[in-house]
Amino acid sequence: MFKKIKLAAIFALGISAHGIAQTPVSTGPYTFSIVKENAVGSIENQCQTGTCWSFATVSFLEAEVLRKGGKSIDLSEMYNVRITYPLKADAYVRYQGKQQFGPGGLSHDVLRVVAEHGLVPQSAYSGIKSGVTEHNHGGLDALLESTVKTVLDKKLNEEGGAWKNSVNGILDAEIGPVPSSFEFNGKKFTPAQFRDELKINAAEYVSISSFTHHPYYAPFVLEVPDNWAKGSFYNVPLQDLERITENALDNGYTIAWDADVSEKGFSYLQGVAVLPASMPKKEEWWTIIHPELTPTAASRQDAFDRFETTDDHLMHITGKSKDQLGNTYYITKNSWGATNPFKGYLHVSKNYYLMKTIGIVVHKDAIPTEIRTKLGMK
């Protein structure tokens, strides 16, 4: 929960014909200069849902379409949610209720849908029922959770897979049946054909993280609740995570970002995320630029081990900025609507990013060659 804070100034956000967000550059004591800004789509709002994983990754894929020379496209977030929920339900029952079941997920869940099914435009699948104006999954999530728990409590799995029809029926009623084909700009597509038309290949994207409890330069299953699919991440030293991030943004790539946003230094209302070295006075939080902590591999690991760093939220890093003192920030696109000073964007300090990153997804080519070699990537 964020307190409502009186903002010093509010600036408009413009979108160019090429989809490049002209991010505003001032709030409170902070004045930002844009260092690098890559082409992205429009700000969206996940509303009353826990589907940031799909919104962030879809935004990332929309940017990939632009980077590859395609036109601006509005892709469906709820298509991924609709495909993924039955997979979560099946896994929950198979693990006898001993793993996460809920609305959360990670970027590799979207990439799995892309690889196995395809992509769908928002115009073909909004996931919003007729007469409803925004996403609200409170009822949907409760119904699905009740269903899978009933399967285990009453041992309905012993009667075959009929219970799966109930899961699909709930999803069809609440967000709509999965489309087998659709029309877009006067042409008929299947989801797989549309994916190929957009030149999106899920195999080109990799998950990266940085923790010391697993060997570096090897894949590992990241132990966070929303990794229900047991997806693998490449583990790299902290300095390599920084190098990958800088190399990606400087060369026109963007980044899907999973992070902890529970710190007091993360303020969507201010549009800034920072990591103060000492706790500021309440009245000085957003009136002074404070010196920041410098994260280390050890401090990152300690925060993760103590659950001080948790997988709270996924967003989309689109560029770089600097404050008036020369500190580096990452321009970050959120999915909570255009409702803060930067119309839905934040400036996240490099220190906050390095300390609070759970994992990222990038295109393989965004990774420096020597790091790719150490990871055994072709």
Language-model features: locations:
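Active-site signature of cysteine proteases
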Residues: 165-378
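Short, positively charged
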Residues: 24-29, 292-294
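N-terminal, helix-rich and Lys/Arg-enriched segments in bacterial and organellar proteins
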Residues: 5, 41, 53, 316-317, ...
